[in-house]
A protein has these predicted regions:
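Catalytic center-proximal scaffold of phosphoryl-transfer enzymes
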Residues: 1-186
Length: 186
């Protein structure tokens, strides 16, 4: 069997070799007006010299285009923390080494690390799946009638999205304004 440390080293070396491809893909993604972002914790063995047999929490940030773009892609960006500076650096926002910075719509959860992006010209677009999850948890754990009613609204919203998924952007927008807005206002 090949030692896990050897496999990890090989993966790291491959990552270094593939970095120009990842950079080109990220640059192409930043030409689109809408991106999705999320982050998830991963265990990371402490660097050489700091090893005491323990791991610490690092994060794998993911950025993807929407299903409506001609190029469907995901870029994963490993970071040693969950700090918002990582998403700002990926988007090339002021205060990072990249400029002038991306100015599209970012679909994300309500994690505070994204908030500085919205103060720097990025438009916040909340993720319906993350919002729905909170209401589902409220309903499932506490029998909340508010949570139950919200879930019924989400069923309606998802049905409208299914109807509109194959339409052109302007047609999707019109349907959303016509059918979704009244539900959101209810």
């Amino acid at each position: 069997a090949i030692a896990r440390s050897t496999l990890a080293q090989w993966v790291g070396e491959c990552g270094v070799q593939l970095q120009p491809l990842v950079d080109a893909l990220a640059a192409e993604m930043l030409s689109y007006r809408v991106l999705h972002a999320d982050e998830t914790p991963v265990a990371m063995l402490k660097p050489a010299g700091q090893r005491d047999g323990k791991t610490h929490r690092a994060y794998l940030w993911s950025y993807c285009t929407t299903g409506f773009n001609p190029m469907r892609a995901v870029v994963f960006d490993f970071a040693d923390s969950r700090g918002g500076q990582h998403v700002r650096a990926f988007l090339g926002l002021p205060g990072t080494e990249h400029k002038p910075g991306w100015k599209g719509k970012l679909v994300s959860d309500d994690f505070s690390g994204y908030k500085a992006c919205f103060e720097l010209g990025v438009t916040e677009a909340g993720c319906m799946a993350h919002a729905r999850r909170k209401f589902h948890k409220l309903w499932a754990n506490h029998g909340s009638t508010v949570g139950e009613q919200a879930l019924k609204f989400f069923i309606q919203l998802y049905e409208i999205e299914r109807e509109a998924k194959d339409l052109a952007a302007d047609e999707r927008k019109a349907i959303r304004q016509d059918k979704t807005q009244p539900i959101a206002d209810a």
